[in-house]
């Protein structure tokens, strides 16, 4: 029998500056295609081959598609916390309540504490985040830590309080 779903959140990279950089990079290679391949004028002082431009343009577009596909799914269920960071985790990682010694929401500094967003940190102190500065801090019975970013801290806090699992 599947545990009851009490809270669910899906997050994607939506920061304007990330998409601005990706758009700028893609634009450069689209311009290169038009200038060199269609216009016949070499692009730049030391132009890349036509095949090189096509391959690079395809790779930058694939990077854009990949960035768009990244998604952090968080679920709070009656038996624990489930997290999937697609496409890195294809299935939910399950953290059962009996494995968690502390569970609380906190404000954090993504760049200072973890070096940015994504799958961050090392073995004993990890973070899964895509935006913002609010997160669910889990401390496990083996003293390892996991911070899961959230854009719904109030709703998450209420769910954890209703379950009696909020520790701080």
Per-region residue spans from a language model:
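N-terminal membrane-targeting/pre-transmembrane regions
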Residues: 1-47, 127, 155
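Non-transmembrane, membrane-adjacent beta-strand/coil modules in membrane-associated proteins
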Residues: 13, 83-144
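Juxtamembrane/interfacial segments around transmembrane helices
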Residues: 48, 72-74, 78, 101-112, ...
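Single-pass alpha-helical transmembrane signal-anchor segments
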Residues: 53-68
